């Protein structure tokens, strides 16, 4: 639908939060764990029971949408992701991310089983949805779709589609673009199959490991970004470009070392994962708390990349995944509280119209220029070329007229020629070559000149043909990147789009029925309350008051239990942070031990004076390191020296006169800067010195 450039609609929405509970897995069944979570999809509530304490009341949380263990992938997509992707196609930014404890089904929700259409997750279903929308668009609408895939592993940003997946990328920020990744590769795609292949390639490069709670545990946060640019005519008659970005985020799960059994590298990964998720929680708390003046986006790479998604220019949906087993009661409650806070975040999303970093307009401009060049080539008349072809026998002329004729020939050779004209010229050259061979009365010199002229014209013609072919190939490549609306691009994804449409229609009918049942239920409850208010005797009134008192008492006990749980959770968070601090302190002490034993104190102070913290890459950098040490030695030119006499003896290291002063200076050079532990900096050739240099000098001089 055309949009007026002067109007930039902005919508202020809360982050939409949904909760999905997976069924008990085989391990939990074999260990005889009990179901502690009950889901009421109609009311949108999740109730958690503490099975080992019958006196404690259950805790109930309410969300926009909830899904039970029997929920289908298509229903999850249509109810949660479809509205976000529709907004992205209109030009808004959108973010969908899954959060939860490790092993709760986040990756299944986001990716699913791509080989089975009914089990595909949000990411592959979005592919079919996007290209289904493009196929239904009007014919004068142009689209450009590109994708990128990155992971955040141990606080390092890596490109999953790049040649070197271990290379660290820098996080940058510009006022006109916002936060972006420098040198992140992006690929233009033409259909859903291309997207699926790229995602499969990136998924193979992702960091995955096994723990006690999950055999295929994600050890990094992954962000799959789809950028959709759309060009169409506005009300003012001009072409306008809208650009929507869709971030599909699969977060690594929070975990406890006691449950996962993580050690070594897995433990380091878990520490970094928990730190970034803790920062994400702090960001959410700061956004919800109206008194907070600072939001710690920069404390983690994850929160910095999701800066727009949380409280910025984006429509965001968070899917909190929980496990049903009583074994994970604390983690389930923590996740639900986390999600409950997130639904209070307000985002201000606006349509990105005519953005500076849009590629679609640039591609369209290049296509127009190439078409213009090709059209100019076909409009050239044959008279411009024939002038140089008719004067072969006048090639020997010199003077002003000859120079002018030569210039005209050069200019004619540079002009673009149509394909038909090229064929005619080639035929004419062949005829002239045959005629030249048959002329016997020509001198050898004239024959050679004429032959050279023919070869030159043939080369010019071949060059023109190559330029024409190159322009055609470039035009074809650019036109393939720009997708025309209304063209069927679904291919294999057509069946998936049909499944999504059918599921969406069925879901709409179920939603209407559920709404009707909810209204009837509310009416019945209201009738029951009215009946309870009408007491026929004092005894009935006493019973009614007792019931109300019990309800209030239950609510009071639930509030007390909630307070106690919050205190316990706060204590657990503190313990977790303290454990992280202890781990970091151990690493810091190890580094300091290495520094104190191998770098002298004087050099340490010098290094500290010349280092600075780089916020973009999150590490310390040494100033002017390019002008030091081996870097300078490599660049220093070696002065030209005459070849040495092979029989000449090098006496530069020999003392020709042993004076007291020269001996003292040479031995004083042995003293070097010492480390903070009192040890001298080791030389390349180690020598044991039992006495100080002054003692050695005095003994030698006696």
Swiss-Prot record:
Swiss-Prot/TrEMBL keywords: ATP-binding, Cell projection, Cilium, Cilium biogenesis/degradation, Coiled coil, Cytoplasm, Cytoskeleton, Microtubule, Motor protein, Nucleotide-binding, Phosphoprotein
InterPro entries: Kinesin-like_fam, Kinesin_motor_CS, Kinesin_motor_dom, Kinesin_motor_dom_sf, P-loop_NTPase
A GO CC term attached to the entry: cytoplasm
Gene Ontology MF annotations: ATP binding; microtubule binding; microtubule motor activity
Record's compositionally biased regions (Basic residues): 675-690
Binding site residues for ATP: 100-107
Region (Globular): 600-702
Compartments where found: Cytoplasm, Cytoskeleton; Cell projection, Cilium; Cytoplasm, Cytoskeleton, Microtubule organizing center, Centrosome, Centriole
Keyword field contains Coiled coil: yes
Family: Belongs to the TRAFAC class myosin-kinesin ATPase superfamily. Kinesin family. Kinesin II subfamily.
Subunit (UniProt): Heterodimer of KIF3A and KIF3B. Interacts with CIMAP3. Interacts with CLN3. Interacts with DCTN1. Interacts with FLCN. Interacts with AP3B1.
Descriptive protein name: Kinesin-like protein KIF3A
Native source species: Macaca fascicularis
Gene this protein is translated from: KIF3A
